[in-house]
Design a protein with these regions (language model features):
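Transmembrane alpha-helix boundary and packing residues in multipass membrane permease domains
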Residues: 26, 30, 41-42, 78, ...
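N-terminal transmembrane alpha-helices
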Residues: 11-42, 46-47, 63-75, 79, ...
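Transmembrane helical elements of multi-pass membrane transporters/channels
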Residues: 21-40, 143, 206-210, 214, ...
Length: 453
């Protein structure tokens, strides 16, 4: 006798209600991050241009570190998720504990290196900058560097909660963190006139608070995944190697992506003030266009890793198809919504006619690319990583970025005279190449041969 429809639905790891409960808080979390980032920028601007520049320089390093910790956290999440798929809860908890300890030790080591190399970072990495900018960067780095271990702990903890299918907790902690950050900024900048310190201190306090809350919650043994309550940590190299097999390729991919953005930004600056402004505004608006996709991509890891752990690739394909469809629908809705608001958004920025026209062209072009290409170029590889196929993602993404995103930016933007618009065209060409490679790999089934537990 075949299974009834109800029995088949019960065999699925995530029903529609569970998927919705996983995705919606992630969308809210991503939206908060973008909105708070914008509010942060406005508050910092009130301190002065030198403060904006100094904070921005240090934040570029912080973004690199956040990417590295997120990659390690993803590695731990994939390992724990695959163990859960095999109903090996004890091993899943051990992998979560190993990831949290390992990521913390790495973060403490990086923090020590940042403090020891502070002078090198300020004078060599940042190059020749004005003394005023250097002063603000120095103050900000001195305070914010202390938040590195807490930032790592939060990233690790958030990944574990998502693996359990519980993104509501991370959303709630994110709200607390952002309230502390924005509230602290407002009080210290506008109330006590602390300048750059007023920006840095709330960042440190909010990250400390988030880390303490998430680790306290993870020590609850009633949870599906929890960490051991002990200060005696013994490294399990076999487990750590599994985590690193995902974390290292993913981290290198993220870091190179960030490096590519910096290289392209240096090219944009050669096109003049209007191009810099158009690019900055376009980046801010474009982030909203892909926001649902970024949230759903985070949801893919716990869902697919559970299926792969169980050896159920049919279910993995089912969820991949379902989540990709949700990504396409939600991104289409968001892009069309942004298109409808674009005239009002551009008016609010008070741009010159040339800058406004260039920005509108970029946003329309980016939006169309986001609807048709972005999900396959960025959400589909999340399925591969969850299946243990992180190296292939790294190779494809790195080759595509250097040849198309960076190489074609110079060809189209500089040599063919397309300016800043050419850089965005090059970016979408990069998406097309990635999408083609990932679709071919998906249908060939190569990604199914890399389960790590």
């Amino acid at each position: 006798m075949g299974k009834s429809k109800k029995e088949k639905q019960q065999a699925y790891f995530f029903d529609n209600k569970a998927l919705l409960a996983l995705i919606l808080p992630l969308v809210v979390e991503q939206l908060l991050a973008v909105l708070v980032g914008m509010a942060d920028s406005i508050m910092i601007a009130s301190v002065g241009e030198a403060a904006v520049s100094g904070v921005s320089l240090v934040d570029q390093i912080m973004v690199l570190l956040i990417n590295a910790f997120s990659a390690l956290a993803t590695g731990g999440a994939v390992v724990a998720g695959q163990f859960l798929g095999q109903d090996r809860r004890e091993e899943a908890c051990k992998s979560a504990t190993q990831m949290v300890w390992f990521i913390t030790i790495c973060a403490i080591g990086i923090t020590v290196l940042v403090y020891l190399g502070k002078s090198f970072i300020l004078h060599t990495v940042f190059g020749k900058i004005d003394q005023d900018v250097m002063h603000h960067a120095d103050i900000y780095l001195l305070i914010v560097a202390a938040s590195i271990p807490f930032m790592a702990l939060y990233n690790g903890g958030a990944a574990i909660f998502r693996t359990m299918g519980n993104s509501k907790v991370t959303m709630q902690i994110s709200i607390i963190m952002n309230v502390i950050n924005i509230g602290g900024n407002a009080i210290l900048i506008y109330g006590f006139h602390r300048g750059t310190e007023g920006v840095a201190i709330p960042t440190l306090v909010s990250r400390m608070t988030a880390a303490i809350i998430i680790i306290a919650l993870l020590c609850d043994e009633k949870r599906t995944l929890h960490i051991e309550r002990t200060w005696r940590y013994r490294i399990n190299w076999e487990m750590v190697k599994k985590i690193l097999s995902i974390g290292v390729p993913n981290g290198l991919e993220n870091s190179m992506f960030q490096l590519g953005k910096i290289i392209v930004l240096s090219l944009v600056s050669t096109f003049g003030t209007y191009a810099i402004a158009a690019n900055a505004v376009s980046n801010a608006i474009a982030l909203f266009q892909i926001l649902p996709g970024m949230a759903i991509t985070l949801a893919i890891t716990p869902v697919i890793s559970r299926c792969v752990g169980a050896g159920d690739y049919e279910q993995a394909k089912y969820y991949n198809k379902k989540l990709m469809l949700i990504t396409y629908v939600s991104m289409t809705a968001m892009v069309l919504f942004i298109f409808s608001l674009l005239p009002f958004i551009l008016k609010a920025y008070n741009l010159s006619d040339l800058t406004a026209k260039t920005t509108a062209d970029i946003i329309h072009f980016h939006g169309i690319g986001a609807i048709f290409i972005w999900p396959v170029a960025f959400s589909l590889p999340a399925t591969f990583r969850a299946a243990g196929d992180a190296k292939a993602c790294m190779y494809i993404s790195s080759i595509s970025m250097w040849i198309f995103r960076i190489g074609f930016s110079y060809v189209l933007g500089k040599y063919m005279g397309m300016g800043v618009f050419g850089i965005w065209v090059a970016m979408v060409i990069d998406w097309v190449f990635r999408a083609m490679c990932f679709v071919i790999r998906y249908f060939k089934g190569s990604w199914k041969k890399n389960a790590i537990v």
